[in-house]
C-alpha cells in the first residue's frame, strides 16, 4: 500500500473477476489500458465502464497505444482518459509529459488539485507537443499501415514463433479490436524462436530500428521486455503473464516498409 492506496490486479478480460473485485474490495477506481503493454490485449471498454458505473467506481483508462485517432474511451463510457504525451501525441522523442481528459464532473476536481500543486510542463515543452500534434494523424496512419504489413510478413517468417498484432486474425482479441479500435495500431509484438538469447542477437543485428524502451516516435524502436520494462520481474512471472522467452516489442516509425523488412530479414538471417 502506497499513499493509502491498496491495489488489486485483475485480468480485465475476465469481466466476472472484475465485477467480483469491484464488489468485494469496495473498489473506488477501475484502471486499465485500451491496448495493453506489451501483450497488445484489447480491453472491452463499454463493458468495463458499465461495471465501474454500476458499482460506483471511477473508470480510468490509459489509451496511449490507441491514441485519440483510433479510440475515444469517453464515448465508451469512461470517466477519465490518460495519454502519454511523450509517445505518439508528441511523436519526436524529445520531451516528457502526460495528459488527462474526461468528464467535467471529474476534471473539475482534478483542476482544483492542479491549482494547488501546480503543473509540471514548461511552456517550451507544451509548444513541442503542439508541434507534434499537427502531424499526429499523418504519422499515425503511416506507421499503422507499415506495422500491419510487418506483422503479416513476420507471421510467415521461419525464425518467428508468434506474432501479436490486433489486426491479425490469429490475435485472441481480433473481433473485439474491430469493436473498440478504428485500426490496429503501430505497435507489433512477436516471439523469436530460440528464446531471449536469440532475440538479443537479432536486436543487436538491427541497423534501421534503434534499441530503446520508448515508443510512438518518428523513428522505429525495438526492445525486449525481459531487459527493460519487465526486468524487475522473475522469468517465471514474465512467462506466466504471457511474456514468453524471446518476446520482442516493436514501435513502428516512419521508415519505408521495405527498409524495415530488409533490416528484419538480415537480422533474423543471422540467427
What are these regions (language model features)?
Residues 1-159, 164, 175:
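Conserved PLP-enzyme active-site core in the AAT-like
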Residues 148-207, 211-216, 234-239:
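Conserved small-domain helix->loop->beta segment predominantly found in fold-type I
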Residues 129-138, 186-193, 249-253:
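Short, well-ordered beta-strand elements within core beta-sheets of diverse protein domains
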Residues 107-108, 136, 195-198, 229, ...:
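Short, acidic Gly/Pro/Ser/Thr-rich loop/turn segments
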Residues 65-67, 87, 135, 150, ...:
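Glycine-rich beta-alpha junction loops
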Residues 57, 96-97, 161, 186-188, ...:
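Structural beta-strand/beta-sheet cores of well-ordered domains, especially the beta-sheet scaffolds
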Residues 1-8, 19-22, 204, 220-271:
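PLP-dependent enzyme catalytic core of the Aspartate aminotransferase-like
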Residues 91, 123-125, 179-183, 240-244:
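Short, flexible turn/loop "capping" segments at secondary-structure junctions
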Amino acid at each position: 500500500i502506497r499513499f493509502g492506496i491498496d491495489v488489486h490486479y485483475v485480468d480485465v478480460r475476465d469481466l466476472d473477476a472484475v465485477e467480483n473485485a469491484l464488489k468485494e474490495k469496495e473498489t473506488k477506481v477501475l484502471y486499465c489500458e485500451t491496448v495493453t503493454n506489451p501483450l497488445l490485449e484489447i480491453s472491452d471498454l463499454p463493458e468495463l465502464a458499465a461495471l465501474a458505473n454500476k458499482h460506483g467506481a471511477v473508470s480510468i483508462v490509459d489509451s496511449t497505444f490507441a491514441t485519440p485517432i483510433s479510440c475515444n474511451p469517453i464515448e465508451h463510457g469512461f470517466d477519465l482518459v490518460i495519454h502519454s504525451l511523450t509517445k505518439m501525441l508528441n511523436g519526436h522523442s524529445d520531451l516528457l509529459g502526460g495528459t488527462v481528459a474526461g468528464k467535467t464532473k471529474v476534471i473539475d476536481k482534478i483542476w482544483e488539485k492542479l491549482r494547488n500543486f501546480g503543473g509540471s510542463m514548461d511552456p517550451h515543452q507544451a509548444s513541442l507537443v503542439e508541434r507534434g500534434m499537427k502531424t499526429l494523424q499523418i504519422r499515425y496512419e503511416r506507421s499503422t499501415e507499415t506495422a500491419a504489413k510487418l506483422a503479416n510478413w513476420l507471421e510467415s517468417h521461419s525464425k518467428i514463433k508468434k506474432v501479436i498484432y490486433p489486426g491479425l486474425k490469429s490475435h485472441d482479441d481480433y473481433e473485439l479490436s474491430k469493436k473498440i479500435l478504428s485500426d490496429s495500431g503501430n505497435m507489433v509484438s512477436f516471439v523469436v524462436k530460440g528464446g531471449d538469447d536469440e532475440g538479443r542477437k537479432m536486436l543487436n543485428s538491427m541497423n534501421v530500428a534503434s534499441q530503446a524502451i520508448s515508443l510512438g516516435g518518428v523513428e522505429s524502436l525495438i526492445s525486449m521486455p525481459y531487459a527493460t520494462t519487465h526486468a524487475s520481474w522473475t522469468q517465471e512471472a514474465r512467462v506466466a503473464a504471457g511474456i514468453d522467452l524471446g518476446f520482442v516489442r516493436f514501435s513502428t516509425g516512419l521508415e519505408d516498409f521495405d527498409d524495415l523488412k530488409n533490416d528484419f530479414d538480415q537480422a533474423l538471417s543471422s540467427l
